[in-house]
Each structure stands twice: as C-alpha cells, then as structure tokens.
C-alpha cells in the first residue's frame, strides 16, 4: 500500500476522533441493551495468543470487504454525521466509571472489526445494530444494511463525561489517547512493517477487539486485540488507565508468517510541517504547525538525547543504535499558544507519547522516518524500535511496554533540556558576508544552568561536532529570560553537494555535561541557491 494515500486519509479521520456531543434528540434517557451473537465463550490472553498463532500458520486472507453501495459512496461530511447513540453505549447500564461506543464502517474504513464484550471471563460478540446509530446527514437512515456488517473501531468515555472520548481505536492498527488536556494529536500503532524502506509499507489490521467489563471501582479498562497482516499475526493486551497522564500497559505476542525486513515496535506517528527550526514549508499564516517538535531518547547507557524534527525536502531515515533502551518518544515541548495561533486545533495542547520498555529489548535501534509534506493533513513523522535480529517465521516475539500520553513524559533528565532550536542565515550583522553559512541558535534551560547564568565566573562551553563542513562563531552565553543558556554557531557547508550534515552539541562546564545531547541533521542547499544577500 502507498503510505501517503493511506495516511492522508487516516490522519484526517483520526483528527476528528474527539467528537462533540450528540444533539439532545439523538439521546435516550435510559440505556438500551446491546444485541449479542452466539453464546459466551471462555476467554483469556493465552487463548488469544493461540488464535494469533493459528492465523500465522495459515495463508493470509485479506480482511477488507466491499461495503454496500451507500457506505462506499459516503463523503467526509456524511460519514462525520454518523454518531453512535449514548443510550446504546457498552456498559451504560452498569455502575462502572467507563463506557464504550463504536465507529461505523464507511469512507476510508472498509475492514470490519469484530468486537466482543468480556464479562466474568467469558467473551460474547456484539452485533451490529442500525438502531445504535444516528445517521445524521449521511442518507443511510432507513436503508437496509447487513446485520453482520460489523464495526470500524471503538472509543472510550468516562461516565462523568460521555461527550468526549479519552481513547479511540480506528483504522488498521491505529489508536490514540489524551491526557488531561483532552486534545488528540499523534497516534500510536500496534505494529509498523517496512516503514521508510522506500518500498510499499504494510499496515496490519486489528481484526477483533475484546473489551473487558471493568469492576465498578476500577480506574483501568482492559482491551485485547487480534492483529493480522500478510507478514505477521499478533495478540495484544492493553490495560488503559485514564488520568492526568493516560497510561497504556501493553503486552504483545507476535507470530511472523515470513521474514520481515523492518519491524517497528511501539510506533509513534505524528505530523511536522513547519516550526522554529525548519521553515521550508512556512507559507501558512500560522507561525508553527506540528503535533510534536522532537524525538527524545533515554538510551540504555543513560544518555539523554533530543533530536528536533524536520520537514525534509526528501525522505529522511535515521537510526539510533542502542541496547536495552530505557525509553523514547515524540514530544511536543513547545506549549505556547502564541507560537501556533490556532484556536481550532490547539497544537500547544497536543500530547507527548513516551514509550517505556517493561524489560530488556536487547540490541536494536530507535528509528526515525521524516517524510516531506506540504500540509498538516499528512502524518509524515514515524518513530519506533527496530530489533537488530530480523523476525523469522515460526518465532514467537513477546514485547511488553508502556505508553504515556500527556503534556510531559514520565521520565526526564536531571540535566538541562533543549527549549528551542532556531536557524537562519549566518554571518555577522553589519559586515559583508564573503561566504555562505547557516546559523543555529539552541536554547537550553533547567538543571544547573539557572545558577550558572548568575555566576560571572562560570565557564560554560559548547561542545560541538559536525560530520562535514566547518563551524565558526561558536558561543554559549546566559539567556536570562529562560534562566538558561543559548548556544550559537555558524555551519559552513562544503563547496559542493547537498549531502546531509549530522550535528552533535551539548554544554559543558569543568569537564561535566550540563545538558542533554542535541542532535540535528541539516541538508545544505545546492551551491546555486546559497544566497548571502
């Protein structure tokens, strides 16, 4: 499948997951029992792993279906007008803290998902019921749809706020969640396959979900998922705890059908169009447009790394080799509304997503894929863990990790961290430039920097390395507005070529690092476009 076509559609649909309240006439005062199929059957995670293992032993069969004509022809506005009725919400007739509602098939969603309710250790399939939906302006009201149509996915609400969901699973293996800010942003996936290889990317599907009815006093919803694709099948367990920072405790068991070139564990999918450091696509009236602004990594060796994101002119792939990583994630550090000026999508409220392995993942790499985009409707950033050993048929891969959704990751470096990265034409103002250079201004705050900024005897230096070219006008000076420091330098690229240049920077005093490590990758313009004005 071509990634751009798939993600442009999926991103637009997922962006609207936080739907407004249903109109009063669409609600009923009393909960209505859901229709079910068959008899309850014993269920546990071991049984689900057995189902995934059996799938992997059989030839793959596509789960996508040709939908009835009226569903195939829905446009965006028509599909968005279809709402699940509150009176049919799963667990609405109980006393627990949570409810679940379901998404209708149609538009971009052609793969039916079977959804089961688990009560007292037994699972029973929920039946598609047209009466559970309000069809709005879709034109589907009163039309006969198959009784075995199925669903596209589901969303979770609290009983105290049935209008807004805090997590949603919709499309392929995509899912999202929010922290206390209540604003959706980036997505996670069950699995990424062959992302950034230059060839077609494979998008596995969750083909069944099993929702376990929580105890009345529980703060956690447990969801199981059965995943399938041409290359692999899998069983997943999600323990979702809602709160100021939403936590998903995930166990997955993967069963490859064939060798996989690039397997992505814990994939985060985001969007970066333009920001302080990269204004290649800055024709929009808004100063910055991004779900996240950087990749953070806490390596197995204890190093903290910050890599600002870019919207590159060409597909860009980076690999950060590690062993037993402690965590990584795509973060939105910039929380200032003035930097975005968008009161419709609220980029300053978009959640960070931090991936924390529950055990040693061994050797591999955190991989970052940055894809060119011309607008915000295309999710062009992906980060994931890629095991060094390529999965082989017949193997069982057990991976456990936690996902944290919120304004800040659960772990942070005691050292100062990067607050902003800005770039522009180099040189000295007021003096004629004799050659082309590109300036970088990197702001750090936290750790010991506030105290050092007040000390006139402090000797803070910028430790800088570049893979190509030369640097000049290197400095590190206090920035009192941030109670931190600003490192600045000009990078002079080689005379010819547009080969990417890798940059590494941190601040140091008395031989001791003061900041996390800042990494960057810059693509110099062709020699003919290097204007010095």
From Swiss-Prot:
Compartment(s): Periplasm
A Pfam family matched in the record: MdoG
A single BP term in Gene Ontology: beta-glucan biosynthetic process
Secretion signal, residue range per the UniProt entry: 1-28
Gene Ontology, cellular component aspect: outer membrane-bounded periplasmic space
Pathway involvement of the protein, from the record: Glycan metabolism; osmoregulated periplasmic glucan (OPG) biosynthesis
Keyword hit for Signal: yes
Gene3D superfamilies recorded: 2.70.98.10, Immunoglobulins (2.60.40.10)
Family, similarity comment: Belongs to the OpgD/OpgG family.
UniProt function note: Probably involved in the control of the structural glucose backbone of osmoregulated periplasmic glucans (OPGs).
Protein name: Glucans biosynthesis protein D
Organism from which the protein derives: Xanthomonas campestris pv. campestris (strain B100)
Gene responsible for this protein: opgD
């Amino acid at each position: 499948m071509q990634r751009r076509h798939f993600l442009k559609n999926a991103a637009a649909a997922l962006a609207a997951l936080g739907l407004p309240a249903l109109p009063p006439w669409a609600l009923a005062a009393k909960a209505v029992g859901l229709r079910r199929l068959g008899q309850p059957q014993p269920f546990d995670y071991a049984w689900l792993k057995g189902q995934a293992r059996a799938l992997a032993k059989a030839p793959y069969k596509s789960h996508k279906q040709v939908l009835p004509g009226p569903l195939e022809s829905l446009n965006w506005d028509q599909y968005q007008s279809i709402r699940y009725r509150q009176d049919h919400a799963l667990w609405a007739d109980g006393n627990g803290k949570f409810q679940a509602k379901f998404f209708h098939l149609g538009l971009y969603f052609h793969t039916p998902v079977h959804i089961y309710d688990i009560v007292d250790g037994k699972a029973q399939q929920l039946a598609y019921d047209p009466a559970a939906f309000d069809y709005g302006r879709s034109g589907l009201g009163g039309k006969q749809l198959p009784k075995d149509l199925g669903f596209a996915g589901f969303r979770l609400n609290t009983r105290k706020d049935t209008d807004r969901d805090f997590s949603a699973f919709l499309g392929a293996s995509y899912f999202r969640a929010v922290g206390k800010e209540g604003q959706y942003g980036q997505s996670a996936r069950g699995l990424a396959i062959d992302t950034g290889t230059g060839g077609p990317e494979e998008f596995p599907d969750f083909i069944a979900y099993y929702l376990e009815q929580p105890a009345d006093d529980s703060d956690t919803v447990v969801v199981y998922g059965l995943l399938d694709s041409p290359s692999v099948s899998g069983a997943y367990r999600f323990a979702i705890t809602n709160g100021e920072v939403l936590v998903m405790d995930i166990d997955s068991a993967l069963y490859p059908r064939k060798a996989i070139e690039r397997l992505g564990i814990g994939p985060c999918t985001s969007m970066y169009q333009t920001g302080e450091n990269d204004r290649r696509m800055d024709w929009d009236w808004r100063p910055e447009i991004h779900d996240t602004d950087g990749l953070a990594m806490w390596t197995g060796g204890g190093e903290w790394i910050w890599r600002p994101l870019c919207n590159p002119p060409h597909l860009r792939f980076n690999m950060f080799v590690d062993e037993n990583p402690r965590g990584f994630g795509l973060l939105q550090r910039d929380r200032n509304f003035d930097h975005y000026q968008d009161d419709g999508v609220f980029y300053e409220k978009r959640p960070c997503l931090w991936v924390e392995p529950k055990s040693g993942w061994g050797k591999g790499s955190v991989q970052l894929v940055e894809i060119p985009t011309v607008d915000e409707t295309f999710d062009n950033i992906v980060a994931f863990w890629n095991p060094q050993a390529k999965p082989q048929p017949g193997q069982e891969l057990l991976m456990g990790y936690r996902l944290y959704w919120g304004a800040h990751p659960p772990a942070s470096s005691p050292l100062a961290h990067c607050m902003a990265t800005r770039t522009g034409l180099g040189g000295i103002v007021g003096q004629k430039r004799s050659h082309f250079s590109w300036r970088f201004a990197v702001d750090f705050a936290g750790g010991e920097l506030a105290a050092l900024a007040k000390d006139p005897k402090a000797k803070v230096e910028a430790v800088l390395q570049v893979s190509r070219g030369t640097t000049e006008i290197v400095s590190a000076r206090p920035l009192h507005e941030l109670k931190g420091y600003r490192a600045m330098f000009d990078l002079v690229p080689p005379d010819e070529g547009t080969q990417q240049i890798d940059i590494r920077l941190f601040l140091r005093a008395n031989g001791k690092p003061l900041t996390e490590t800042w990494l960057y990758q810059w693509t110099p313009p062709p020699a003919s476009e290097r204007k010095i004005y």
